[in-house]
């Protein structure tokens, strides 16, 4: 069975990678779908994020990385995918994700959303936190894959925030 794990992944963190690996133990195929979020100001372009994720996940079988503009359910319907994977870190994540799952189900009745609880050691990590700490010169190497740490350093040297 195929599932999609969508997100802005700006940038991908070790928490995301953990969810991806755990989802792969449940599903035969997983599409990591890089999406736009108009409410977020992204440091990396969609294509940069896609490339970074492909580098980070290159040793995993059963993973495809794709990019999508627009409604998530449109992508799912187009590709015949009926399962959505989401990670939950805290109660605040649950409230938002429940609302999104119900809205997506209304738009695509065949869709099921599977929630994976974040592993405790990654439960505090978010892409926003990673960017903020990196911006102020903090060490984020325990929160992101090495490829991402390098890309963050390069972006910050360019002055892109």
UniProtKB/Swiss-Prot annotation:
CDD domains: PPAT
InterPro entries: Cyt_trans-like, PPAT, Rossmann-like_a/b/a_fold
GO terms for MF: ATP binding; pantetheine-phosphate adenylyltransferase activity
EC number annotated for this UniProt entry: 2.7.7.3
Subcellular location: Cytoplasm
Pathway: Cofactor biosynthesis; coenzyme A biosynthesis; CoA from (R)-pantothenate: step 4/5
Entry keyword set: ATP-binding, Coenzyme A biosynthesis, Cytoplasm, Magnesium, Nucleotide-binding, Nucleotidyltransferase, Transferase
Reaction catalyzed: (R)-4'-phosphopantetheine + ATP + H(+) = 3'-dephospho-CoA + diphosphate
One of the protein's GO biological processes: coenzyme A biosynthetic process
Pfam families tied to this protein: CTP_transf_like
Task of the protein: Reversibly transfers an adenylyl group from ATP to 4'-phosphopantetheine, yielding dephospho-CoA (dPCoA) and pyrophosphate.
Subunit structure: Homohexamer.
Similarity comment text for this entry: Belongs to the bacterial CoaD family.
HAMAP family: PPAT_bact (MF_00151)
Listed name of the protein: Phosphopantetheine adenylyltransferase
